[in-house]
Amino acid sequence: MSSCGYSLRESSSELLQQDLVLISDNSDLNLELISQLKAKGNKIFRAKNIENENGLIIRIKFHELNKFSGAIGAGARTTQARLDYVISYELSSKREIIIEHIYESTKYLSFNQSDLLSMEREEKILVKNFINDGIKNMEFHLALKDNEN
């Protein structure tokens, strides 16, 4: 779709087919982040001292998913679950810190006691979506920084 020289971008190439150094612990969230970055054709290195002169270093400072349940009525049965996702990251090159940012997102799940397996599957999908949105946030800030320069 385009009009007057403006067009919508399908996706960003900021984190596509690059050599990336990712500094983080080995939590499930960080391992999923690595998996999604690899799926975009990136080579992921986990050591700081890797020869990556022009490459990007991603330092995950904080990566967390919190789950909360909401209940209403006299029986106080859980009717809804809330998932809060937070990733705090620093993007840098060997020479300088480019970006420090915290990305947060919240999603809600309807709770159905009779279909817990379905809810678990839906939660796994939401986690993948949270991480994908976190990567898009990184790409957005990298593109913004490139446009400033």
Predicted segments — roles?
Residues 2-42, 146-149:
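A structural "domain/chain start" motif
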Residues 37, 41, 91-95, 138-146:
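Sec/Tat-exported extracytoplasmic proteins
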Residues 43-54:
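Short acidic low-complexity segments
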Residues 56-102, 108-124, 136:
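Surface-exposed short loop/turn segments
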Residues 121-146:
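Short, well-ordered alpha-helical segments
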